[in-house]
Amino acid sequence: MTREQLYSGKAKTIYKTDDPDTLITEFRNSLTAFNGEKKGEMEKKGYYNAQISKKIFEMLEAEGIKTHFVEMLSDIDMLVKKVEIIKIEVIVRNIAAGSITKRYPIKEGTVFKTPVLVFDFKNDEYGDPMLNDDIALALGLATQEELATLRELALKINELLVPHLDKKGILLPDFKLEFGRRNGEIILADEISCDTCRFWDKKTGQSMDKDVFRFDKGDISKAYEEVARRIVPEIFE
């Protein structure tokens, strides 16, 4: 399969293929935090994130959630369906952590009675600001019906992920989702990995995600490897 680079993001590179209906996502070893202000590299990061995403996409597909995942072409190359990305990041919060504890009088570790769902404008230039429905509509990012669909899908994904990860000794304080339009439908895109989720060890509360790099909490490689061992143990056999 031929490939031509379409664009390169903070941690993934996207390629065109000879099939206009598919793209290749290459998961790189790049680490970034604070909108690219802090940078680093980690051996096998791309591998772990790609394999974690694959496994979670497959689980969600089995539960009726449509995703852009097609197949793995290599350890780090994922063949995906081409979608029109919706420029809205959908954040689902189950336990208070990160920015919400700085913006509001909520203590870190507070368990929300119901998930807190937030929309952010996917735009680095403006620092990914929070959106409400009116602003999203004014910017032409989505229709009212699409916003409702984003909420419905995100909450359904959360309902599936929380117990799935809990069985593996992982808490899911919050995570970011991205969606795209394809053939009149909205489907899950991007990735679900240590880069896009907060993963805490169920017993210790220890971070096992990009916060380890972001806030110098310890060995980032060990954190990502531990999550991979729990979610995709077969890659270590």
From Swiss-Prot:
InterPro entries: SAICAR_synt/ADE2_N, SAICAR_synt_PurC, SAICAR_synth, SAICAR_synthetase, SAICAR_synthetase_CS
One protein family per Pfam: SAICAR_synt
Record family assignment: Belongs to the SAICAR synthetase family.
Gene that produces this protein: purC
Organism, as annotated: Methanosarcina barkeri (strain Fusaro / DSM 804)
Record's keyword terms, sorted: ATP-binding, Ligase, Nucleotide-binding, Purine biosynthesis
GO aspect biological process, one term: 'de novo' IMP biosynthetic process
Pathway: Purine metabolism; IMP biosynthesis via de novo pathway; 5-amino-1-(5-phospho-D-ribosyl)imidazole-4-carboxamide from 5-amino-1-(5-phospho-D-ribosyl)imidazole-4-carboxylate: step 1/2
GO molecular function: ATP binding; phosphoribosylaminoimidazolesuccinocarboxamide synthase activity
Catalytic reaction(s) noted: 5-amino-1-(5-phospho-D-ribosyl)imidazole-4-carboxylate + L-aspartate + ATP = (2S)-2-[5-amino-1-(5-phospho-beta-D-ribosyl)imidazole-4-carboxamido]succinate + ADP + phosphate + 2 H(+)
The organism's place on the tree of life at top rank: Archaea
Record EC number: 6.3.2.6
Disulfide bonds: none
Keyword Ligase: yes
The protein, known as: Phosphoribosylaminoimidazole-succinocarboxamide synthase
HAMAP family, per the entry: SAICAR_synth
